[in-house]
């Protein structure tokens, strides 16, 4: 713990930005944050659900059109001891000019227009070590690969290649309050060229509408139980998304067809995934957002499942206090996970956040966590 604190102080002592005087010289930018997060179960035995502190450092080196970006964490986790230590987040080299944008290395790749739901956005897997009781950006796992994008005024074309796939991080240790149990997970695909992921996305930005088409040859990133063992298999995703502003509203839509997707039990079948979302910027610092995602699997008895989200946020006290509720609603089984938070900015760098996570479910995806409702507090200092 002492070494983590010392390195944290060193990070904070580094100047936030060092800028060269001419464009052809090397430019260096250093920034990051220190945060600490603690959560307690509201039901008996009122134990700690999470207790972790972190230093995040981000360094950008740039000269001309080329550069490199590295972000890393130093973590102390009082509950999950194996999570304590150094964690490389992203590390990639890039080249960017008026039309070309190339990134090679460990990076987070996002597709689609869905908010905290995965339809076409299936390249970067998820860290479910604490399920969804983390910031969504922290849940994404970077992948090592190449991303090439060519942009024009009204469209761009993106191609991706991931030689070695990354997969969901699932909590199976009983010492973790978020454990799903001792589920055996099969071997990940061998590191061979024929197992690489590849795909592309074509996006258009027109007056009154943005839309895109995407395709990806990939794997099921979350293991599927087959004869009691979690397995990974090949699948292909074909998708499209759109976003349309209408006055104070934004209408979002997304659809993804998963071809030859592995189903529970080992069968393979196509599945259709569709989402409709509506954002309302109501004025007076109010924002409301609702989504409904539906999945149809062309196999078995339970072919249809539905999941909704609802986000409501309001800024108060000259935008120093941000109130928000974000809920996942299991339409199929009636469960809900609702994260409420109050974020108060003590100054431009220091934030204090108080929150409550509510789980309520008798069956379905949230039932395993029905006793995990928690009260949490977070402090964050940015530098």
Q: What kind of feature is each model-predicted range?
A:
Residues 60-177, 207, 361:
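Outer membrane beta-barrel
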Residues 22, 28, 59-63, 94-97, ...:
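Residue-level signature of outer-membrane beta-barrel architecture
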Residues 312, 356, 371-383:
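Outer-membrane beta-barrel "beta-signal"
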Residues 65-70, 100-102, 154-157, 208-211, ...:
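Repeated loop/turn-to-beta-strand initiation elements of outer-membrane beta-barrel proteins
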Residues 51-57, 88-91, 142-146, 196-200, ...:
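Hydrophobic, lipid-facing positions within transmembrane beta-strands of outer-membrane proteins
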Residues 32-38, 70-74, 104-106, 159-163, ...:
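Transmembrane beta-barrel strands of outer-membrane/channel proteins
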Residues 243-329:
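Detector for outer-membrane/organellar transmembrane beta-barrel domains
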């Amino acid at each position: 713990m002492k070494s983590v604190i010392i390195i944290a102080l060193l990070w904070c002592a580094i100047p936030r930005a060092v800028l060269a005087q001419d464009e052809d010289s090397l430019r260096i930018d250093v920034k990051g944050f220190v945060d600490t997060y603690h959560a307690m179960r509201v039901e008996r035995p009122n134990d700690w659900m999470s207790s972790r502190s972190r230093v995040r450092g981000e360094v950008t080196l740039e000269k001309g059109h080329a550069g490199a970006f590295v972000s890393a964490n130093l973590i102390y986790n009082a509950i999950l001891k194996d999570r304590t230590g150094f964690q490389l987040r992203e590390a990639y080299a890039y080249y960017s000019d008026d039309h070309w944008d190339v990134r090679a290395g460990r990076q987070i790749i996002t597709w689609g227009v869905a908010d905290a739901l995965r339809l076409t956005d299936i390249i970067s897997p998820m860290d479910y070590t604490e399920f969804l009781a983390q910031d969504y950006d922290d849940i994404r796992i970077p992948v090592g690969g190449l991303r090439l994008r060519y942009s024009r005024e009204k469209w761009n074309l993106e191609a991706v290649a991931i030689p070695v796939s990354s997969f969901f991080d699932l909590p199976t240790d009983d010492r973790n309050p978020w454990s799903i149990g001792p589920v055996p997970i099969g071997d990940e695909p061998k590191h061979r060229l024929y197992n690489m992921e590849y795909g592309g996305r074509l996006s258009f930005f027109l007056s009154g509408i943005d839309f895109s088409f995407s395709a990806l040859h990939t794997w099921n990133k979350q293991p599927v139980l087959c004869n009691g063992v979690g397995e990974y298999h090949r699948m292909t995703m074909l998708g499209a998304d759109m976003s349309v502003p209408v006055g104070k509203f934004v209408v979002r839509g997304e659809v993804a067809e998963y071809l030859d997707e592995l189903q529970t039990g080992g069968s393979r079948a196509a599945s259709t995934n569709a989402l409709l979302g509506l954002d309302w910027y109501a004025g007076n610092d109010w924002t409301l957002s609702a989504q409904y995602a539906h999945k149809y699997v062309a196999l078995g008895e339970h072919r249809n499942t539905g999941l909704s989200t609802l986000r409501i946020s309001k800024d108060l006290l000259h935008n120093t206090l941000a109130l928000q509720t974000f809920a996942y609603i299991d339409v199929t089984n009636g469960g809900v996970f609702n994260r409420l938070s109050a974020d108060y900015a003590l100054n431009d760098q220091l934030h204090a956040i108080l929150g409550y996570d509510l789980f309520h479910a008798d069956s379905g995806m949230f039932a395993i966590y029905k006793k995990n409702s928690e009260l949490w507090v977070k402090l964050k200092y940015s530098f």
